[in-house]
Amino acid sequence: MSSRFFYGGGSDSDSSSSDEEELYSDREEEEKSEEEESSEEEDETSEEEESDEETGARKFLKDVASDSEEEEEEEKVTVVKSAKDKRLDELENTIKLIENAKKINDWAVISTEFDKLNRQVAKITQSGPTPKIYIKAVADLEDFVNETVAKQKSGDKKLNASQAKGFNAAKQRIKKNNKDYGNLIDKYRKDKEDFMESDDEEAIPVIAAPRITKLERIEAPAAAIDDDGFATVGRGGKTLQYTPESILKHLRVIVESRGKKNTDRMEQIRTMEKLLEVAQTPYQRIRVYLTLISTRFDLTSTSSANYMAVDQWKSAEQDFSSLLSVLENNRDHVVFEGAEEWEDDEKQPTIAPGETLYIPGSIVSFAERLDDELTRSLQHIDPHTAEYIERLSDEKLLYTDLVRAQAYVEGLNEVEKTDPRQDSVNRVVMRRLEHVYFKPSQVITILEDATWKSLPSELDSSITPRASSGNVENLVLSLCNYLFKYSDGIIRARAMLCQIYFLALHDQYYRSRDLMLMSHLTENISNFDVSTQILFNRTLVQIGLCAFRSGLIYEAQNTLSEVCGSGRQKELLAQGIIMQRYSTVSPEQERLERQRQLPFHMHINLELLECIYLTSSMFLEVPLMAQTSSSPEMKRRVISKTFRRMLDYNERQVFTGPPENTRDGVIMSAKFLAAGDWKKAAEMLNSIKIWDLMPQPDKIKEMLSQQIQEEGLRTYLFTYAPFYDSLSIATLSNMFELSEKKISAIISRMISHEELAAALDQVNNAIVFRKGVELSRLQSQIVTLADKSMNLLEANEKTLEQRTQGMANAFQRDQGAGARGGRGSGRGGQARGGPRFPGGQQGRRPGGQQFGGGALGGAIKA
């Protein structure tokens, strides 16, 4: 009994010492293992020491005379296990956790426990063969993975996001891990019961890696250096070898490290550049290019820079162009967003004749990212420097890539037409359209010629053929019509706006106006995103500028008033941010606002825009002010509040000097025109230098002079009509230097619009004014009172509708004499604008009580 006592509990026993030596030897062999493994070793060592203490010193101090205590001590002796047995127990526990996770389909736990299982079996195989329970576990786990894949493809069971992520990670690791145990797994699957009952276990030979001392680590790189240059050295002094067989493995490591901290992106880029040199097959080059371009874009997301570095952008553009060249020369390799990823890094996929290999990736996304990065850099570069001009020249490279990408995705869509492929074509066509719609025809012609010359001669596009590249209008029309036919939503609306902008830019006012009206974008533009609303504002402004160049002053002022009348032209056109003192804009909103700003070369000249708006307002406001001086009922009518406010401010000045800017020049010209001196007004307006920025400035100035003559005539007639009985047309012709035919046409138009109470005497070639048509003072006051009453009534109705939240029917009464109809009773009343009832009664307006008493009420109704 005493020998057994000392054998089981003594700290100096052979068994205990051998266990201790085994643990210490294990710890020495695994000095450079992971922290998690070392912590597990420490836990095991501490557990053994605790068990030794319990079975050693404490037992030795107990009373040996007690038989019951001796029996308990003997039972405790049987619990003591060696390190190998403990590791096997841990292995079994881990396998049980995996089996439980398989029952509930918890792939996150399976992935974690599988990694732990491999670490545990690595320790066991260092001193013995591979456990059969491990072979059974990994073989069953691989079968379970295959079953899950089959269920996924058949659609019987779908995994959620977290399960799918864990499943993909576990599937790759299991497949890669089981290659090392292929023979044992095959034996297990042939006869599972015989394999588990047999006693022989095959041991996988493990060659211990020789320890490398610090001196050897220092000398190893030197030994790897050739006479020609340097060699890349990895961990442990090993020289990294880049071979065609290792390309996919290197790419796998780079992809898995994406998004992690402390990752050297530049080193990864250099690695992939070396992989390109050793790549032999098209598949290898395509895979490397896809990863390389994505890594270059990641440099911007991980740095503090606002935009991508110019050298990296150009490198990414060259890689993208090379990728397209490889794809064009190898039509059996297709980059497609929905393709499945190739998981076997040991070998490459083989393509049978007539088959197509689909590689996961997106050509259109790369083109869009290049476009976005170029735009972002142009936003942050000072536009008044040579750097901006140099950077803008890169747009030619980008446009060439867009045309090339369009031709590539067109070919894919023609082979097999699907919604994702059609969407890719729409996106790249939209990007191309956004690069040409705002440019003059001459610039587009030069850009198209240079693009097609740089592309391979066999490359062509079915949407915009190479042969028709010289016709700019046909180019824009073809791109827009394609998007009208095959796209919808935002892309279709943006294509419509781009076409309208292009037509207005090239002086086709009526076509652009009709397209804008027929598209109904004015009614639902608020439902689109902010970028589309900005494009809508730009298009609206361009239509107004086109109307002004065509001499359509009223149309120009009416179109520009919505944008220019608000005083927020910069913000509405995305050409600058207005910082207000008490602004409640958050930093995130301000950042988004800055991202929406357009590059400088796409800007519309705001000073020219303001000058055109004020000039158009002057031509309408000055005759109107002269007309209202003798017509009190029209005093409340204002066409442009902005122009009126500027004119009033200028008139309040005691001393007015010569005009110093464009705005002062227009206001001074308006004062001369109101005073009847049209020659000085024309001279002052034509002296503004900003007209030289418009195409054909001489034609514009001639049009302005003619408009001043006509509006000067109208102003003169409005001002002095009460003092004339008749006026000779010949006198007016000499006064305003207009032909008598032109003057007769202007006066006839004024008479037909009831602006002038007169008649043309064609016999005497004169104007005969009618007297007594002006309103008396009492009549003017009655009209003013009626106008105010109507405005008050409308304001009350609007307030009532807001408070009742549109419940207009609750306040309508029966139209019968003295009858009160309940809700739902038959009534003949109509809404505002409906047909009148017999006797002159009109339907009640919804939402309020009808005003219907007295002579004043009758006057208002009339």
UniProtKB/Swiss-Prot annotation:
Bias (Gly residues): 818-862
InterPro entries noted in UniProt: EIF3C (IPR027516), EIF3C_N_dom (IPR008905), PCI_dom (IPR000717), WH-like_DNA-bd_sf (IPR036388), WH_DNA-bd_sf (IPR036390)
A Pfam family assignment: PCI
PROSITE patterns the record matches: PCI
Subcellular location: Cytoplasm
SMART domains attached to this UniProt entry: PINT (SM00088)
GO terms, biological process: formation of cytoplasmic translation initiation complex; translational initiation
Location of region: Disordered: 1-81, 813-862
Keywords: Cytoplasm, Initiation factor, Protein biosynthesis
UniProt record similarity statement: Belongs to the eIF-3 subunit C family.
Subunit structure of this chain's protein: Component of the eukaryotic translation initiation factor 3 (eIF-3) complex.
HAMAP family associated with the record: eIF3c
Protein name listed in UniProt: Eukaryotic translation initiation factor 3 subunit C
Gene for this chain: nip1
